[in-house]
């Protein structure tokens, strides 16, 4: 990946990443010698960031150099998925360099919109290649996107990026709620955020078969990982199991043993915080901005989706072929933007339930 501040200053014309922050830091005395940007390849798993790029070793060396040059500890600032990478780094360096390293070299950590417990949008992205960003774009752009890079092609691509799997939600129902209640439900809620995925029939004029259980129509966080495994290929399943854990550990002895197990280092619910008494952790999040929390989904075959597209005069179907192993249309999921229930609280928005 590109390195230095230029690697993440501006994403595109009018869209800045770190450039405005860099400019404001420069105004209060920071310069190129005192600011380092650690760019990483977010497609890679945490293990492979070190195995291929020696990313964490380089980051460790940067902190040690700063301590020698300036005689004081550094501040680590992260954004979004960078928060997860940062937490893995703290556990990695504690394991590799000893329990005193963080206390010696890092003054504080500032996490901006950190993804420590994952994000809801990761689940539909892996299942369907969709999220609110894609289903709400104008119809013309949606047509072009589906024509040249379909949702199923996007989902297949997302599932090859082991790094993005670190964004899958962690902690199960204890954190995200169950089928009747979630901690962030509003007082007058008629729908609970605990049902992360709410499936509706492909044909809205029909009901689900009696054989479809409530657990199949409403998928909670604890059931989500198994649901994801059932709807994705073996390669993705092996990658997930060999790189990440999604649980919530309460046993102290197991938490201590997890400190030696690198697949738990992206999950702050299964490992202890770093042994650094003076380390300060600042977590900054937006307030008052609607955020994706749960989804309405429709589950049908590739033939169902092909028929729907043909009805809309979108006859491209190259990516919706039949399964080679069974000869039957593939089972796929889509965010269901048809669901518009003004009498529900929260009100569905383009197939999503928005939370704080």
What would you call each of these model-derived segments?
Residues 276-282:
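Short, proline-enriched alpha-helix->beta-strand connector loops that line the catalytic pocket
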Residues 1-160, 165-194, 199, 211, ...:
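N-terminal non-catalytic accessory region
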Residues 286:
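Glycine-rich anion/phosphate-binding loop at the beta-strand->alpha-helix junction
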Residues 14-25, 52-67, 201-275:
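A Trp-anchored, charged/polar loop motif used as the substrate-binding/catalytic surface
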């Amino acid at each position: 990946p590109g390195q230095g501040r230029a690697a993440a200053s501006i994403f595109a014309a009018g869209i800045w990443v770190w450039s405005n922050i860099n400019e404001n830091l420069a105004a209060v005395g920071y310069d190129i010698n005192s600011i380092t940007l650690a760019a990483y390849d977010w497609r890679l798993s945490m293990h492979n960031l070190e195995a291929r790029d020696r990313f964490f070793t380089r980051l460790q060396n940067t902190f040690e150099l700063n301590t020698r040059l300036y005689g004081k500890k550094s501040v680590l600032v992260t954004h979004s998925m960078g928060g997860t990478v940062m937490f893995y780094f703290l556990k990695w360096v504690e394991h590799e360099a000893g329990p005193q390293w963080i206390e010696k070299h890092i003054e504080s950590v500032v996490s901006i919109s950190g993804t420590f417990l994952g994000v809801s949008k990761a689940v539909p992205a892996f299942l369907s290649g969709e999220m609110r960003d894609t289903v709400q774009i104008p119809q013309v752009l949606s047509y072009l996107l589906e024509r040249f890079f379909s949702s199923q092609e996007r989902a297949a691509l997302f599932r090859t990026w082991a790094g993005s799997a670190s964004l899958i939600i962690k902690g199960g129902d204890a954190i995200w709620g169950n089928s009747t209640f979630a901690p962030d439900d509003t007082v007058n809620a008629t729908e609970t955020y605990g049902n992360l995925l709410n499936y509706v029939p492909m044909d809205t004029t029909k009901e689900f078969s009696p054989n479809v259980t409530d657990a199949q129509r409403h998928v909670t966080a604890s059931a989500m990982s198994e649901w994801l495994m059932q709807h994705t290929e073996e390669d993705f399943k092996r990658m997930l199991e060999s790189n990440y854990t999604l649980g919530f550990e309460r046993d102290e002895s197991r938490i201590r043993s997890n400190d030696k197990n690198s697949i738990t280092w992206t999950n702050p619910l299964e490992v202890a915080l770093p042994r650094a008494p003076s380390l300060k952790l600042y977590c900054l999040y937006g307030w008052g901005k609607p955020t994706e929390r749960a989804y309405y989904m429709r589950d049908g075959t590739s033939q169902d989706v092909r028929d729907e597209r043909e009805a809309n005069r979108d006859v491209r179907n190259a990516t919706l072929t039949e399964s080679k192993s069974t000869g039957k249309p593939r089972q796929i999921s889509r965010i269901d933007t048809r669901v518009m229930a003004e009498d529900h609280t929260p009100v569905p928005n383009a197939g999503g339930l928005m939370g704080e």
